[in-house]
Amino acid sequence: MKNIIISKQGEISENYKRFEDVLKKKKTKLIIVNKGDHLQIEKDVYIDIIWPDNSNFIKENILNNNSIVCKINYKNFSMLFTGDIEEIAENEILKENTPQKLKADILKVGHHGSKSSSTKEFIEAVSPKIAVIGVGLNNNFGHPNKGVLERLKKLNCKIY
C-alpha cells in the first residue's frame, strides 16, 4: 500500500502513534484530508473530499460524524462513500454543498443503513441509481433500517 488517507480525527485515537510507526516502517505515505480537498489519482480519476471539516469537528458521536465522505469520479461515473456519518453530519454536508456536488451513480449508504443516517433530503440530493449497504447478516443492530430501505426504494434505487 503506497498511501493511506485519513482525516485529522485519526490523530485523536489512542492508537494513532502506533499506526504512524507502522506506516513509517512500511514506507506508506499518510495523507490527512479535509473537506474541499481534490486528489488527482490518474488522468480521469479523482477524489473530492466532501467531509469532515478538520477545523470544526462535530462533537456528537465524534468518530461516526467526522468520517471521511468522499466522491470518487471516473469520467462520467461517480460513487459517494459516506463512512459512518449520521443525520447531523448529513445536514452539515447539505448546507455546504449543492445537490450537483453530491449527486452520484452509486451511494455507499452511511452508518450501515442505520435509522440515524440516510435522511430523505440527503438521499434525494445524492440521487443514486445504486445503493450499497455494508451489513452483517442477522446483525444485532437490525441494520439496515426499514425506513432507510423505503427511502431508497422510493427513488427506484437498486439496493445491494
Residue ranges and their predicted role:
Residues M1-Y160:
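Non-globular, low-confidence helical/coil segments that flank catalytic cores
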